[in-house]
Amino acid sequence: MASSCSPSAGSLQVSLCLTVAFTLARSAAGTVDDAQSFALQSAEPYVKEGFQVREDYWGGDLGSGEKKAVRQQLFKGNEYWFWMGTEVERAKISVHIYDSEGKLAEQPDSWEKGHFAAAHVIPKGTGSYFVIVAVEESPEERTHWALVYGFR
């Protein structure tokens, strides 16, 4: 007798079929963990330059054209990089850093390359800074993103 996921199948079998279908759909769509992997991939060359990547990170999902602000305490005397990534290869993302007065604070070597972006800041003073992440465009309705950072 062939197994099936029809409504007449037993409740355990239907439950198992739904679990498998959900798992397959989830893995096909990607996750914030996948996005974090890409963000960490962006950080690799900077680790060789002496940057220490922090374990904490931010993540979520945004639609095309949406932005999110992340507040972070930065310290004068340190140098920081913020790296953003997404698993959606055809997405275009960005990350920018502003000081507490709303002035752009990032260095000119900040960059955007498709589904990777990075912003570099050397704070002029200790205080709260605002990191603005955005999904500029994406073929997906919602795009997972993750932001990691490092300092030296």
Question: Could you say what each language-model-derived stretch is?
Answer:
Residues 79, 90-94, 142-144:
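Exposed beta-strand and adjacent loop surfaces of beta-rich binding modules
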Residues 89-104:
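Short, surface-exposed beta-strand/strand-loop-strand elements in extracellular ectodomains
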Residues 30-51, 97, 128-152:
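C-terminal edge strands of extracellular/lumenal beta-sandwich accessory domains
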Residues 1-9:
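N-terminal secretory signal peptides that target proteins for export/translocation
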Residues 62-64, 69-78, 120-126:
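Extracellular and analogous surface-interaction loops
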Residues 11-25:
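Bacterial N-terminal signal peptides
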Residues 54, 101-108:
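Surface-exposed loop/edge segments in extracytoplasmic proteins
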Residues 69-87, 130-134:
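Hydrophobic beta-strand segments within beta-rich accessory/binding domains
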